Amino acid sequence: MLDEATIAALAAELHEAARRRIQVRHFSLRHPSMTIDDGYAIQRAWVRRRLDEGRVVRGRKIGLTSRAMQQASQIDEPDFAPLLDDMFFAPGAVSFDRFIAPRVEVELAFVLARPLRGPGVTLADVLAATDVVTPAV
């Protein structure tokens, strides 16, 4: 497990790299004992920074839902993350200038008619709260 100072430093590094549009070396290569929970702690710290800058959480995503993508990423489970307001684009062309190494991965988007609150949310709760399911990139 990473300590709080390391988590904060890595979140700051990620934030600066995104701002400057540069890639960072995989954190897990520099911190071989890093866990999935550490990765989510870094994500939470990075999101807090973005929220402090005025960004707003507009949704959530689940990635690496296919076994092939999990194997390519050397991860054995789907991942999840919040989607911030500046991660949404109007229909039409999207400028590549904003991205470091653009790639497209098609996922399913569940548009909710009402919020889900946990713990204890069931599959039936998700289905009942879902307004529409649509492809997303």
What are these regions (language model features)?
Residues 2-137:
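Active-site microenvironments in enzyme catalytic cores
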